[in-house]
């Protein structure tokens, strides 16, 4: 990233962080400081192994997602509902996504390993996601933001099923989801506390937060630990990966 581009991206990511902090919590948006063991409140406007599936050069096909909580329907009524969902996510409560254009600034492109690593490090340097509670709404906001600002097709942000630590399925994305225990007093701070909505979004009922892990640039942990979640791309016999998914209670087709 060049100097001018970095400044522009920095302003854009600051808007992203503010929007994420407001999502499903308004003044209760917050994050967990794991190193200090304290919950921090932020007010609005605050400051590789063998047989690995290739993550680069993949051809994008509409609706071809893994476990992202949303997808891109081809056309018709589903397409209309999808567009309305995106509009609701961006414009809910008359709270516009700061600085995000209606259409992508650049041509759409698939996420690549290098791009994912670069964006991950930049987000970490700017304090973008680290320690922030995860929710499906924040997931979608991040997808929308990357699509509109960077032209990145929203099919890349996928994590292992859990329970426990959820590792990114896209090799190069350096943000994993880590379960945290939230004190009852913090959970009851307000009706839509991000910690409460995170647990309700998760099929295992765990409260998750984003955590930066630079080792994920060199270790494809999601594939090495849970190859069955990659289905036909795992290199495992079909009967084997389906049996493993069934044993873990993970639906498959």
Curated annotation (Swiss-Prot):
Keywords: AIDS, Host cell membrane, Host membrane, Host-virus interaction, Lipoprotein, Membrane, Myristate, Viral immunoevasion, Virulence
Motif (PxxP): 104-107
Signal peptide: none
Disulfide bonds: none
Gene Ontology CC entries for this record: host cell plasma membrane; membrane
Annotated lipid attachment (N-myristoyl glycine): 2
GO terms for MF: GTP binding
Membrane topology: Lipid-anchor
Annotated region (Acidic), positions in chain: 88-95
Complex and partners: Homodimer. Interacts with host CD247/TCRZ; this interaction induces down-regulation of cell surface TCR/CD3 complexes.
Family label: Belongs to the lentivirus primate group Nef protein family.
Name under which the protein is recorded: Protein Nef
Organism of derivation: Human immunodeficiency virus type 2 subtype A (isolate KR) (HIV-2)
Gene (UniProt): nef
């Amino acid at each position: 990233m060049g100097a001018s581009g970095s400044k522009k991206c920095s302003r854009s990511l600051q808007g992203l962080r503010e929007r994420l902090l407001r999502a499903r919590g308004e003044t209760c948006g917050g994050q967990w400081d794991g190193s200090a063991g304290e919950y921090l409140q932020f007010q609005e406007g605050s400051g590789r192994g063998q047989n690995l599936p290739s993550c680069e050069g993949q051809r994008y096909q509409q609706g071809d997602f893994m476990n992202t909580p949303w997808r891109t329907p081809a056309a018709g009524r589903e397409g209309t509902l999808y567009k309305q969902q995106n509009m609701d996510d961006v414009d809910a409560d008359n709270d516009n996504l700061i600085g995000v254009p209606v259409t992508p600034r650049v041509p759409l492109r698939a996420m690549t390993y290098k791009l994912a690593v670069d964006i991950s490090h930049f987000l970490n340097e700017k304090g973008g996601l680290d320690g922030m509670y995860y929710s499906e709404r924040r997931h979608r906001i991040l997808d929308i933001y990357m699509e509109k600002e960077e032209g990145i097709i929203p099919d890349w942000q996928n994590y292992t099923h859990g329970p426990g630590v959820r590792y990114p399925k896209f090799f190069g994305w350096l943000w994993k989801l880590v379960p945290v225990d939230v004190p009852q007093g913090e959970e009851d701070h307000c009706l839509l506390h991000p910690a409460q909505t995170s647990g309700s979004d998760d099929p295992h009922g765990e409260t998750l937060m984003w955590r930066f892990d630079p080792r994920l640039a060199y270790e494809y942990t999601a594939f090495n630990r849970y190859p069955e979640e990659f289905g036909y791309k795992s290199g495992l016999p079909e009967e084997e990966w389906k049996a493993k998914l069934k044993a873990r209670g993970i639906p498959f087709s």
